[in-house]
Curated annotation (Swiss-Prot):
There is a cross-link at K218 (Glycyl lysine isopeptide (Lys-Gly) (interchain with G-Cter in SUMO2)). This is PiggyBac transposable element-derived protein 1. GO terms for biological process: regulation of transcription by RNA polymerase II. Keywords: Isopeptide bond, Phosphoprotein, Ubl conjugation. Residues 170-199, 271-297 are annotated as: Disordered.
Length: 809
């Protein structure tokens, strides 16, 4: 906003006015500090005034007191020094005299030094009341006044009154029928208020309402009392400190009928331009009169775009010795050819509406009193996260210990399910019905008579499972007799029937597809699989989150460091043994949901989604492990707020300037050496360890102790016994292989039959994963007499082909 400069200005004949622009960050800083202090004060009062009668017993009373104290002091956000400062501040405010306590408590204080500053300001009575402006109307009595123009809304200007300033409220006159008439008479008292808005918003076109001029006058005594009551005590200490440092100089002179100049006593002085008759009338009555300009009959309205452009021209001027004049008039009788040739005091001067810039050479006074203001620099992006504070100590996690009982696995053990029943926990009747219905719907849309049944669909799945451990170059060879006699397949389903069903296999309605989802044709099946996987997943403490690959040479996705490097990338959350709990095919980062946090990135938001999936089973302290693609200090802080523990390797550019030992320097140390730091605000540890190589890890739950002794190999593959290994490294090594174990199991007996549809490879992947999960449950339910993955798959494939053979005839 623009605000009148309270300091001296050069005196010249053009009546130029110098104003300053307020800092637009005032309101944001004040609102955030006042809101935080207000919330903290409420928590303190609730803690101090808590009554024993509010609880139902001593145990509950103690728990509520502890919770209220936690909400007040917030130990997870404040250090010990900050908590001590809060307690000292509270006691300091308590011992103050009663007449000072109400004055001090109106400020959002955060430390004792701020309270002392407020008390000193109250005692000395010195304080900056903001940048203010007033207007003197020339006349016999010279009453100080401030003009307020009704109908004008300048978003770039805000004036605040000095104590004791009389206000004048003016509105433009109606279009006169003859000569201008003088306006006089008593007027009720009122105060002028100008709207204060952001200076970067678009300027609003000033418009004067065609109403008769009205004048509101206050005496100096009444105005002084009103302003003294409000004063500036409502401003916070931070806002007052900012008042003198964030102003930008601009120029403005509002003179539809008058000129405004800055006098040496720092007050606006309005010079009234009237005719000789009106001057005589003003002298006789002893009251200042304002000239009412008639409407120009042949004037041309000024376009809104032009008005806004002129306002923006003045607003964007660089500070310095810049002085400008702005003439604002009603758009109803404003034109670009407004002149003052008919006025006796200034016949030669011609000025256009909202135009005219001049530079004052008389700037010696300003240079003596004010420092040079540099041009506005480009704003740098400021992170919303506070600066990290690192300390070298071990972590002290406050997570509860793991004590959950897996009742679902106990029920499966008691039921003693066979491999087929375990597989159908995931491909249940609901899933088969979904596939059958969508396949028949798709075939009918193509005018194909199919009418496939659930029994036939199970036969098709039996052939697909059989192809995983009995491979042929062509799928037609499963029905040949010459050298690959497969009576089991021939008796189960005819070749042409299999080809017809397999070519029309479908999983979603083409009439209701989400174009933003790349895998919309598989989305119903993916949701059904994720629901069943989570329903029967073992309830464990540790889980692994990583990337997997579904082999497909038509894909342009590449993943280095995996057995399968080309295909579809899939995000997987598994147990430490390889049971898949949740998966999601990779899509571009542009497909992220609106409610996801952009600061966490794609990998961080995927981990948060997996954590939410686990928390659906219960609020347990799960422990997630993942690699450096996902890990960041912000992610571990967000997981800690959800009550989820996490550990992972971290990249160098995500350590938040943690002062760990340099990698090159650590290579000169002995193997087993490690360095670590704690982030004090969120209690997150970073550790760099030199073992087989140098790795950096981050955790919100596991620290250094206990330190273990392990063996490793050097560069020549020679074993080095007994080197130190922190506990954080041990936990990560034990939990990081979950996804790799799943990939290893399903890679041995993958489904080999594929169709021409691009998503058939993903359907085969889901069948293999369901078989892996069923085998994991089989091994957990029968630890001593379990089948290996091959025998388990053969059992399911033979069952589907044998028990549904007669249905295809």
């Amino acid at each position: 906003m623009y605000e009148a400069l309270p300091g001296p200005a050069p005196e010249n004949e053009d009546g130029l006015v110098k104003v300053k622009e307020e800092d637009p960050t005032w309101e944001q800083v004040c609102n955030s500090q006042e809101g935080s202090s207000h919330t903290q004060e409420i928590c303190r009062l609730r803690f101090r005034h808590f009554c024993y009668q509010e609880a139902h017993g001593p145990q509950e009373a103690l728990a509520q007191l502890r919770e209220l104290c936690h909400q007040w002091l917030r130990p997870e956000m404040h250090t010990k020094e900050q908590i001590m400062e809060l307690l000292v501040l509270e006691q300091f405010l308590t011992i103050l005299p009663k007449e000072l306590q109400p004055c001090v408590k109106t400020y959002p204080l955060e430390s004792g030094e701020e309270a002392v500053t407020v008390l000193e300001n109250l005692e000395t009575g010195s304080g900056d009341t903001g940048q203010q402006a007033s207007v003197y109307i020339q006349g016999q009595d010279m009453h100080p006044m401030v003009a307020e123009y009704q109908g004008v809304s300048l978003e770039c200007q805000s004036l605040q009154l000095l104590p004791g300033i009389t206000t004048l409220k003016c509105e433009p006159p109606q279009r006169p029928q003859g000569n201008p008439q003088e306006v006089s008479g008593p007027v009720p008292h009122g105060s002028a208020h100008l709207q204060e808005k952001n200076p970067r918003d678009k300027a609003v076109v000033p418009v004067f309402n065609p109403v008769r001029s009205q004048t509101l006058v206050k005496t100096e005594e009444e105005t002084a009392q009103a302003v003294a009551a409000e004063k500036w005590s409502h401003l916070s200490l931070t806002r007052r400190n900012l008042c003198g440092n964030s102003a930008q100089e601009t120029v403005m002179s509002l003179s539809p009928m008058t000129e405004e100049i800055v006098t040496k006593d720092r007050l606006f002085k309005a010079k009234q331009e009237t005719s000789e008759e009106m001057e005589q009338s003003g002298e006789a009555s002893g009251k200042p009169n304002r000239e009412c300009a008639p409407q120009i009959p042949c004037s041309t309205p000024i376009a809104t775009e032009r008005t806004v452009a002129h306002l923006n021209t003045l607003k964007d001027r660089h500070p310095g010795d810049l002085w400008a004049r702005m003439h604002i008039s009603s758009l109803e009788y404003a034109a670009g050819d407004i002149t003052r040739k008919g006025r006796k005091k200034d016949k030669a001067r011609v000025s256009e509406l909202l135009q005219g810039l001049s530079f004052s050479g008389d700037s010696d006074v300003e240079k003596d009193n004010e420092p040079e203001i540099q041009p506005a620099q480009k704003k740098l992006k400021v992170s919303c996260f506070p600066e990290k504070s690192w300390t070298k100590r071990d972590i002290k996690p406050n997570f509860p210990s793991w004590s959950a009982l897996d009742s679902g696995l106990l029920n499966l053990k008691s039921e003693k399910l066979n491999p087929v029943e375990l597989f159908e926990l995931f491909f249940d009747d609901e899933t088969f019905n979904l596939i059958v219905n969508e396949t028949n719907n798709y075939a009918s849309q193509k005018n194909v008579s199919l009418e496939v049944t659930v029994q036939e669909m199970r036969c098709v799945f039996g052939v697909l499972l059989l192809s995983g451990f009995m491979r042929h170059p062509r799928r037609e060879m499963y029905w040949e007799v010459s050298d690959t006699d497969q009576n089991l397949v021939r008796d189960a389903i005819r070749r042409d029937r299999f080809e017809l069903i397999f070519s029309n296999l479908h999983f979603a309605d083409n009439g209701h597809l989400d174009q933003k989802d790349k895998f919309t044709k598989l989305r119903p099946l993916i949701k059904q699989m994720n629901k069943n996987f989570l329903l029967y997943a073992p309830l464990e403490e540790y889980y692994c989150f990583d990337k997997s690959m579904c082999e497909c040479f038509d894909s342009d996705q590449f993943l280095n460091g995996k057995p399968i490097r080309i295909g579809y990338k899939i995000w997987c959350g598994t147990t430490t043994q390889g049971y898949l709990v949740w998966f999601e095919p990779y899509q571009e980062e542009s497909t992220m949901k609106v409610d996801e946090d952009p600061d966490l990135g794609l990998g961080g938001n995927l981990v948060m989604n997996f954590a939410d999936v686990l928390l659906e089973r219960g609020q347990y302290p799960y422990h997630l492990c993942f690699d450096s693609f996902f890990t960041s200090v912000k992610l571990l802080s967000a997981l800690k707020k959800k009550g989820v523990r996490a550990t992972g390797t971290i990249r160098e550019n995500r350590t938040e300037k943690c002062p760990l030992m340099n990698v090159e320097h650590m290579k000169k140390m002995k193997r087993g050496y490690f360095d670590f730091r704690i982030e004090e605000n969120n209690e997150i540890i970073l550790c760099r360890w030199y073992g087989d190589g140098i790795i950096s890890l981050c955790s919100n739950a596991v620290g250094i102790e206990p330190v273990n002794e392990v063996s490793c190999c050097d560069a020549d593959n020679e074993e080095i016994p007994q080197i130190s290994q922190p506990s954080i490294v041990k936990v990560y090594d034990e939990c990081k292989e979950g996804v790799a174990k799943m990939d290893q199991i399903i890679s041995k007996y993958r489904v080999r039959i594929r169709s021409k549809k691009w998503y058939s490879i993903l359907v085969s992947y889901m069948i293999d994963v369901a078989m892996n999960n069923a085998w994991q449950l089989h091994r957990a339910c029968n630890p001593g007499a379990s089948l290996d993955p091959l025998d388990f798959r053969r059992f399911v494939a033979h069952f589907y082909l044998e028990h549904n053979a007669h249905l295809s005839d």
